[in-house]
Amino acid sequence: MTDVNPVAVVGIAAIMPMAPDADAFWANITGGRYCVTDVPPERWNPALYYSPDHSARDKTYSTIGSWVREFEWDPIRWKLPIPPTVSAQMDQGQRWALSAARRALMYAGWPKWTVDSDKVAVI
């Protein structure tokens, strides 16, 4: 490979369990915070999916995990072109991705930046 394209990371964001933003996530890491809990009842019912038998089909043998519980989602206030009916039907993962992308762009100076938007990407 001879072509090298430099990349500048100028904005960061994260939505993680017990960390609605990158700063809280870093604080959890540096503070050694344990972010694993029992499954919240709004996620799934352990009575339906749990089995202590590790070989049970269509079951899990664990009732713990890390769960995103808080993050900001306000597409109307953010003036995103997402109709409320579409927003209401979006998967939570899509909302997390859009919210984190928006926050990373803002961290980088958007919407007041003076860079060529064709050279901007969110990964």
What spans do the regions from the language model cover?
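Terminal amphipathic helices with adjacent charged low-complexity linkers/tails
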Residues: V115-S117
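Extended hydrophobic secondary-structure segments that form protein cores and membrane-embedded regions
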Residues: V120-I123
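ACP-dependent fatty acid/polyketide chain-elongation machinery
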Residues: M1-S87, Q94, L98, R102-W110
